[in-house]
Regions:
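Conserved, charged catalytic cores of large soluble enzymes
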Residues: 1-74, 166, 170
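Function-dense linear segments that define catalytic or interfacial modules
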Residues: 50-164
């Protein structure tokens, strides 16, 4: 509780789960195997914890790196705590979210024109933020400037769907 945890799994791990195989737990510092466990048992523990308290989140390492938009820059090894930003080590992302309910008219219509306009404005704002940001290290500043890491998302989709009359299980 009061933390945000993720577990990163590879396709090899998922295959070990499917095949009732064993899985080596690797120490991050020295790369040595510290324990070998039943993959399915570990998967069950991860799944139960996620069901019980919404943590850990899952990150699919193989897919993340297969879909990597800048693979020549290196592997994607980590994310920010909420996992909405996954990119190269020594980068930072300036994040913003737009509240979708602000684009809902009283009659229930979604204001696409203003949503598109706000998206353009926020993209420019985030671009300026990258140029003005004070990053914690020179390496992070250089890579963030080079790759222009912007993150524009949306919030309150649940509220928008409820206001439109969609039930949670639809």
């Amino acid at each position: 509780q009061n933390s945000n945890n993720s577990v990163r799994v590879s396709n090899d791990f998922l295959e070990a789960v499917e095949n009732d195989g064993k899985w080596d737990l690797i120490q991050r510092i020295n790369g040595k195997v510290c324990e070998t466990v039943e993959a399915r048992s570990l998967w069950d523990k991860i799944s139960h914890a996620a069901w019980a308290c919404a943590d850990p989140g899952l990150q699919y390492d193989t897919t993340i790196n297969e879909w990597h938009t800048c693979p020549k820059g290196g592997r994607i090894d980590a994310s920010n705590p909420c996992s909405e930003y996954m990119f190269l080590d020594d980068t930072a992302c300036n994040l913003a979210s737009m509240n979708l309910m602000k684009f809902r008219h009283e009659n229930g219509d979604f204001d696409i024109d203003n949503f598109e306009h706000a998206t353009r404005l926020w993209t420019i704002t985030l671009e300026i933020a990258v140029m003005m940001a004070q990053f914690p290290s020179k390496e992070i500043a250089i890579r963030s400037y080079d790759y222009r890491t912007l993150g524009l998302g949306y919030a309150n989709i649940g509220g928008l769907l409820m206001a439109a009359g969609y039930s949670y299980d639809s």
